[in-house]
């Protein structure tokens, strides 16, 4: 019985490690590039709200964030520096400057 339990824990540990290995970790000071059709918002709250509207299929409400310049499209071939990471959201700035506050984007937009 103890052997079976040990095998179950070993398999569960390997499964968890493989999932973690597939999910690339983004860290502050890392240089990143964004995928096509990515966007960033002036605050994490604005990003959360825009993502909520996007996932709900509410295109007009989401578009209002872009019309008011609360969210902007990010170029896919530019380098950005990660300032801060909160869950799956990253605060980023242009890699060429030393700003300490920037825009927020979801890590699903980052090229791996």
Give a label for each model feature.
Residues 11-13:
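Repetitive helical segments and hydrophobic/amphipathic motifs
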């Amino acid at each position: 019985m103890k052997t079976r339990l040990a095998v179950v824990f070993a398999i569960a540990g390997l499964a968890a490690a493989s999932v973690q290995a597939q999910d690339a970790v983004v860290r502050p000071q890392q240089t990143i590039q964004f995928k096509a059709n990515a966007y960033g918002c002036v605050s994490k709250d604005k990003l959360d709200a825009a993502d909520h509207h996007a996932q709900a299929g509410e295109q007009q409400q989401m578009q209002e964030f872009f019309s008011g310049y609360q969210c902007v499209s990010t170029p896919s071939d530019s380098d950005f520096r990660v300032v801060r990471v909160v869950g799956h959201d990253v605060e980023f700035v242009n890699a060429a400057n030393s700003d300490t506050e920037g825009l927020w984007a979801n890590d699903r937009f980052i090229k791996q």
